[in-house]
Amino acid sequence: MSFIPVAEDSDFPIQNLPYGVFSTQSNPKPRIGVAIGDQILDLSVIKHLFTGPALSKHQHVFDETTLNNFMGLGQAAWKEARASLQNLLSASQARLRDDKELRQRAFTSQASATMHLPATIGDYTDFYSSRQHATNVGIMFRGKENALLPNWLHLPVGYHGRASSIVVSGTPIRRPMGQMRPDNSKPPVYGACRLLDMELEMAFFVGPGNRFGEPIPISKAHEHIFGMVLMNDWSARDIQQWEYVPLGPFLGKSFGTTISPWVVPMDALMPFVVPNPKQDPKPLPYLCHSQPYTFDINLSVSLKGEGMSQAATICRSNFKHMYWTMLQQLTHHSVNGCNLRPGDLLASGTISGSDPESFGSMLELSWKGTKAIDVEQGQTRTFLLDGDEVIITGHCQGDGYRVGFGQCAGKVLPALSPA
């Protein structure tokens, strides 16, 4: 138990301690903090208290404006930092609890803070690792007989996304302009996206990277995974459908991707690990691992339109529905010698379960626009309207506590008028 009061339904008990980057009106410099209850512990203020063998010579990483250098230190430093923080925040430890002057400088209320991206994201890769999602999309566009493409059960399919347009929760998303072909009997047209979608995803940050030309074996992959965030991979379905053959997504995805600001460390998630999904056919040896690395993370998506008094839940899903694990994704990404770097972001792909209410995109929930999605208060949707706010939340439920991620939220702004 922490000396900082933590409500039972708080996302941020002492069992969590996620890392983020924040600033305040009184101190506009972005700095690294840890969430505890409704407070933020400023690590730049208490960096001198990290005196263990892994961090004593690297206290300066907590003076940085991003988490990249801390991520790059590796598991020994992460575990030491977590143990030190849990000790310092414990109700039984006087070092921070009883130092009123230090406490006053070290703690900031989350309500008064502005959150920033937790890392400088050099590269961003989006996978497509939910079997149910891939099957649903395949049925819609190719039919049941060809729902899964031949490679899907043999490797974690992915594509390189756009790192520059990843934004932190709360940043509005502008409806994109682009080229589309709504009528196949007519030439393509240019205009505002008409089929704007959200995608329920999660993503993990890479810790230490690998040398150029040297793959990461799957037995070591866990050493390179720092922690996880929620993600909304906004998608312009009409732009995407017209452009994606033969090279895959481009402008239909690159206009904006939202992530939650708090990075939940993998050690906080390990109590919620569950068995990996059965994979048939068995993957090639470089992708095989017996270590459980699938997690029971409850996820939900809510939508709040203009004129709605409260948000309506449109999806409830769970990260455990993923077919390919993060270890497999990271190993496959590096198997050709591709070098990953601290702060790189690797996303899960849309997370869908077998229950229609667990489908993680409006494309699936509306079944390609043929079914209305009830958002309560007399409103329905097939795709997103201007003014709609999408709010993703997620948590692991413990015994009397929860390890949560906060919110991943964004509001749709109208498209800019064509030039």
Curated annotation (Swiss-Prot):
User: Pathway it belongs to?
Assistant: Amino-acid degradation; L-phenylalanine degradation; acetoacetate and fumarate from L-phenylalanine: step 6/6
Keyword list, A-Z: Acetylation, Calcium, Hydrolase, Lipid metabolism, Magnesium, Metal-binding, Phenylalanine catabolism, Phosphoprotein, Tyrosine catabolism
Q: Which InterPro entries match?
A: Fumarylacetoacetase, Fumarylacetoacetase-like_C, Fumarylacetoacetase_C_sf, Fumarylacetoacetase_N, Fumarylacetoacetase_N_sf
Give the EC number(s) under which this enzyme is classified.
3.7.1.2
Q: Which residues form the signal peptide?
A: none
Disulfide linkages recorded for this protein, renumbered to the chain, are none
Q: Which reaction does it catalyse?
A: 4-fumarylacetoacetate + H2O = acetoacetate + fumarate + H(+)
Q: Which residues bind Ca(2+)?
A: D126, E199, E201, D233
Q: Which domain of life is it from?
A: Eukaryota
Annotated GO biological process = arginine catabolic process; L-phenylalanine catabolic process; lipid metabolic process; tyrosine catabolic process
GO molecular function annotations of the record: fumarylacetoacetase activity; metal ion binding
Sites binding Mg(2+) sit at D233, K253, T257
For the modification N-acetylserine, which residues carry it? S2
Question: What tissue specificity is annotated for this entry?
Answer: Mainly in liver and kidney.
- Which residues does the record give as substrate binding sites? Y128, R142, Q240, Y244, T350
In the record, Phosphoserine modifications are located at: S84, S92, S309, S417
* Annotated catalytic residues: H133 (proton acceptor)
User: What PANTHER family is this protein classified in?
Assistant: FUMARYLACETOACETASE
Q: Which family does it belong to?
A: Belongs to the FAH family.
State the NCBIfam families in the record. fum_ac_acetase
Q: How does it assemble?
A: Homodimer.
| UniProt name for this protein | Fumarylacetoacetase
Which lineage ranks, top first, belong to the organism behind this chain? Eukaryota, Metazoa, Chordata, Craniata, Vertebrata
